[in-house]
């Protein structure tokens, strides 16, 4: 299973007698899937309904998205951030101060994927800074998103080549 590999139109019947159609997708080179091994695709390809997780963060706290990315709450009022990622992806909260050292020490061991062996080929994380003024999703392309509910300054880190964008919250 590799995201974006539907080869032909697939007709999916719905209960009311209508249909939806799954069509071949577009390969987007700025998605996480292109930086993972086949065995690690399970962390970004949900097989069950995603269970959002809400984290109450104080300013200057960080959420690691396993070893695949990082979300820094730089400043703002304490608030809940809701993470929408595959249920298998482990998120880890820590203080912003020392977060880079924490990543260097634990990427590939506590923060997996990627494993320590895969980390040698994994692109470095790149920082993207955003000032949020309304309910907004911070999207890690091909991985998931974090909903920011109130005004905040945040930094989102993703592997070089993976897009991080913001959009008006969809949920």
For every predicted segment, state its role.
Residues 1-171:
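Helix-rich effector regions associated with P-loop NTPase G domains
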